[in-house]
């Protein structure tokens, strides 16, 4: 699928399909201005269907033998509520409405006058591209795509075409994350994630370090290896480095939880626990590898990025870790494992210690960590915790620009009492109330206090049963866009600071 920008009127684009978004207060005037030659045909048809241009209202009309032969019209509601996220959703909705029409080209006409050109371009292209994503890898027959061959983003100057490659790189990162998370655990495991990381390194000239079990043991990664010891597939600790072409001004670490399947261990997941979906427990790893694929292509000036994941499975076997076992993490802290189904934080513990050893300017980890976060925020919003207000604001702003839901949660220090152990430095779980908070407090024990750090719990938005806006059902690729936006902002700030002296 190709994209291009054009400031020419819709009627002059020569597309066989046109998709419009109209505001409820002025839809007749907008229709006449956008498609003057067809307005007299379309307005009576819309009135017959009692079209009010309410948000989400959508109608399609076929005109065989005419140009365009298909017109799709969507209501946008009132203009005062039409923000960047609404623009992204409108583009996605109109693109999906064209699916199956086998158009050569679809002209997309949405009101973008209130947006900066680059903001509009991002929302329109990502909205369309990601909504039309379809995973056909595991079907016996691949049906031919009937999606538009080209989508023309009307109202944007053709000079903006040079930015389309950057947007395609971001979409490719999201789609890689979706593919990794959606694939079954007999396809994606620690070894295949190593192959994915190596593919990124080879394609874009990055550095990859892979630690096997012996190397992890030499580094004292007892928490990570306690989880891995029950699996028949060997663990792989992945460290991908994306270096800029010039001098390094900032160094960031992205850490992703990489549990390719989570049985719960001896605290086995039972009915209602969605064990059949526990392939998505590596959603954090999927997100950071997806972001790595994008960032490796973009090569942001002055920014060195370290992507880290401790990949393994959490399985039941004769070698699996016992409930009640005490293990030692690589920073020397001892952990009583009172629940083997709280394994992700154990793998992250050693990954965070490793990341701190790189002395980055900031660390962000992503993990499908707790059901408690899903209960609190649902499946559209991730929760995040950070003791650093500056980093927290950066992530909040990045998520807003990316169109991904993110909500800051409290690091209530008194809740740390719930992690007290009578035998070890701490337990790996606390009481059920505030479970996502105690999980974040646990992770905080493995981060040097002088390094800005944030933990993002993506257990809710990593997966969508029914699909939503730009996300088809299944794996969403959540987190990639936010991470890329954050890295871009950090690189821009570093460049601006340098230029100011």
Swiss-Prot record:
InterPro entries noted in UniProt: Leucine_aapep/pepB, Macro_dom-like, Peptidase_M17_C, Peptidase_M17_leu_NH2_pept, Peptidase_M17_N
Cofactor stoichiometry and binding remark: Binds 2 manganese ions per subunit.
Residues the entry annotates as binding Mn(2+) 1: 262, 341, 343
Annotated catalysed reactions: Release of an N-terminal amino acid, Xaa-|-Yaa-, in which Xaa is preferably Leu, but may be other amino acids including Pro although not Arg or Lys, and Yaa may be Pro. Amino acid amides and methyl esters are also readily hydrolyzed, but rates on arylamides are exceedingly low; Release of an N-terminal amino acid, preferentially leucine, but not glutamic or aspartic acids
Subcellular location: Cytoplasm
Enzyme Commission numbers on file: 3.4.11.1, 3.4.11.10
A Pfam match: Peptidase_M17_N
GO molecular function per UniProt: manganese ion binding; metalloaminopeptidase activity
Gene3D superfamilies documented for this protein: Leucine Aminopeptidase, subunit E, domain 1 (3.40.220.10), Zn peptidases (3.40.630.10)
Co-factor(s): Mn(2+)
Domain of life, source organism: Bacteria
A biological-process GO annotation: proteolysis
Residues given in the record as Mn(2+) 2 binding sites: 257, 262, 281, 343
One Gene Ontology cellular component annotation held by this UniProt entry: cytoplasm
Keyword rRNA-binding: no
Function: Presumably involved in the processing and regular turnover of intracellular proteins. Catalyzes the removal of unsubstituted N-terminal amino acids from various peptides.
Family matches, as NCBIfam families: PRK00913.2-3
Similarity comment: family membership: Belongs to the peptidase M17 family.
Name of the protein described by the UniProt record: Probable cytosol aminopeptidase
Provenance organism: Synechococcus sp. (strain RCC307)
Taxonomic lineage from the root: Bacteria, Bacillati, Cyanobacteriota, Cyanophyceae, Synechococcales
